[in-house]
From Swiss-Prot:
GO terms for cellular component: cytosol. Pathway: Carbohydrate degradation; pentose phosphate pathway; D-ribose 5-phosphate from D-ribulose 5-phosphate (non-oxidative stage): step 1/1. It holds the Pfam family Rib_5-P_isom_A. It catalyses: aldehydo-D-ribose 5-phosphate = D-ribulose 5-phosphate. The gene is rpiA. Coiled coil: none annotated. The keyword Metal-binding does not apply. One of its GO terms (molecular function) is ribose-5-phosphate isomerase activity. The lineage of its organism: Bacteria, Pseudomonadati, Spirochaetota, Spirochaetia, Spirochaetales. It comes from Borreliella burgdorferi (strain ATCC 35210 / DSM 4680 / CIP 102532 / B31) (Borrelia burgdorferi). GO terms for biological process: D-ribose metabolic process; pentose-phosphate shunt, non-oxidative branch. It is an enzyme of class 5 (isomerase). This is Ribose-5-phosphate isomerase A. Substrate binds at residues 27-30, 86-89, 100-103, 127. CDD domains: RPI_A. The keyword Isomerase applies.
Amino acid sequence: MENQKILVAKHAIDHYIKSNMNLGIGTGTTIYYAIKYLSEKIKSGSLKNLKFYTTSSDTKYLLSKEQIPYESNFSKLNKNLDIAIDGADEILLEKKSLIKGMGGAHLMEKVIAYNSETLLIIADETKIVKKLGTKMPIPIEVAQNAVGFIMTRLEEMNLEATLRICKEKKGPTITDNNNYILDVKMHVENPEGTEKYFKLFPGILEIGIFNHKNTRIVYYQDKQIKEA
């Protein structure tokens, strides 16, 4: 799968990323390869004057390691970014709907994605599903003081929700925004409706279902790179 990630990352960057763009950079294993390749193109001079806006502390670390300057303060931005490039945990090709958030950064990933003209997703073949929720739970970022209320509400809906635990710290996972994450097991019949519905719950900051109006997907399947 690692080779597939490298191939789709290179294809996406070669075909979509141009000099002088403002780019949002997501989080995850596929983005690692995208950052490595972006670094090569910047150092060779084939890409110039790019501005990078990050979605997580992990991404900041990777960019710093490649000596790529980045912006983490979005308060002065008054227009959309050109492209947000990111990976996905599950992809429903027919609707271009996604599950993201297994890395715990989906709130800022969505802020960046939904304030970009294009959301460019890169993925290996394991991420393609026929229904969202098939392989992965739906991540929900929740205010710490609201987690009990939200879990009760989900139980009343007959949904199984688990508080994500950080193995290293032996306690609940804390996001970069100082919130908790609930992983909810459910098959998503209506991605857009589900995203909107859960955002109505007081205490839910964000749900890891993405339905960007202009999503481009570069993925590997049947031994070749495809686009949707």
